[in-house]
Amino acid sequence: DKIHVGAYTCIGAHCVIGDGTDIGNGCDIGDGVTIGENCRLHAHVIIRERCKLGSRVTIQPGAVIGSDGFGFLMGDNGRYVGIDQVGIVELGDDVDVGANTTIDRARFGRTIVGEGTKIDNLIQLGHNVVVGKHCVIVAQSGIAGSTQVGDYATIAAQVGISGHLKIGSKSVLGAKTGVISDIPENVAYWGFPASPFKDASRQYAALKKLPALIKEVHALKRNLESPGK
């Protein structure tokens, strides 16, 4: 009576579920999963085998924790062959995960989301990503495999981050930023490729003036080629 399990939910073998946890209808909990105390899994959440959730974790409907990482090799026969993803996902205490978000299991080791981090809807975290403590990741952002995000970072909506990078603690990435290199700590970046916010703002302002500037250059060119006309 210390936990609640909704209708049509399947819980695999050797799972450990903490007191006060509420698992909604139609969830699928794989073998060997650990779920801490006072967690809330809404309807149709999938937690795949051996993944670990801390206490007071909330996961919104349709999220998938521990899906296979995206790993393939080209075989000798000219066809892609899947690489086994044998790691897990580990969510710290007080993590929130939004609806239809997917967090891939590590190829080896762990994909980690640190305590207190808040993840919005429709987020993709690739295999072996490490997100620090008390970060915020807003809707439709994606982080490719093996990237590390420091504590207290803020990632706004529709940000794309390449793999094997380091995003500094307390950094801020503006909406639609494309990140292809490391980001320092305590900075605000924006645009593509990601640049310091002031630089990116100047670039955007200059870009808006480009059509008029092109017309002016064409007019000057005509005057030089046909003076007096």
Predicted regions, residues:
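Long, leucine- and charge-enriched amphipathic alpha-helices
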Residues: 195-229
